[in-house]
Amino acid sequence: MHKDVIIVGAGISGIAAGYNLKKSCPNKSFSILEGRENIGGTWDLFKYPGIRSDSDMHTLGFRFKPWIHDKSIADGPSIMEYLHETINEYKLNDNILLNHKVDSANWNSKKSLWELKINVNNDLKDMTCNFFFLCGGYYSYTKPHMPYFKNQENFKGHIVHPQFWNESL
């Protein structure tokens, strides 16, 4: 499958890229590939109690869909609702492909395009595109950074990483 543009990541940045591409280049084909089973990136992944933005939503949110809620520092569920509203309002659903993880991307100079290997539920698919736009996060979903704390081995409680929050806590 060939697209003019492949956007990687269906979080805030990928959704913004999709909106702007659709508005400014309506004749260009594009897909937003999301490696996980849901859109939202950080806001879908982290589920611990009290998760909220560390920046005000007037800054973090979209220029084309201003944040209109009373609380400018928003909780995670409110941000997810905002992202879903945006996708629906601007008809980006058909452009988003969930469970599509980029395994490799190679530039082919002879053909002047990107050749991608996409893992879709452990099945590799080939895709090509002219423009490859990376809008993914900066961390691993499966192997987060775990800092070492002095005397950590003597701590008698549970050490919990927020990325793997246990709902029973």
Model-derived regions, located:
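Glycine-rich dinucleotide-binding loop and its adjacent helix/turn
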Residues: 61-62, 66-70, 75, 79, ...
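N-terminal Rossmann-like FAD-binding beta1-loop-alpha1 element of flavoenzymes
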Residues: 3-32
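Short amphipathic alpha-helical segments
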Residues: 19-20, 44-45, 144-148
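Active-site acidic short loop of glycosyltransferases
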Residues: 2-3, 27, 128-130, 157
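Feature captures the FAD/FMN-dependent oxidoreductase FAD-binding
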Residues: 70-141
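Glycine-rich active-site loop/strand segments that organize a redox cofactor
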Residues: 37-85
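Carboxylate/His-rich catalytic cores and anion/metal-binding grooves
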Residues: 32-41, 128, 133-136
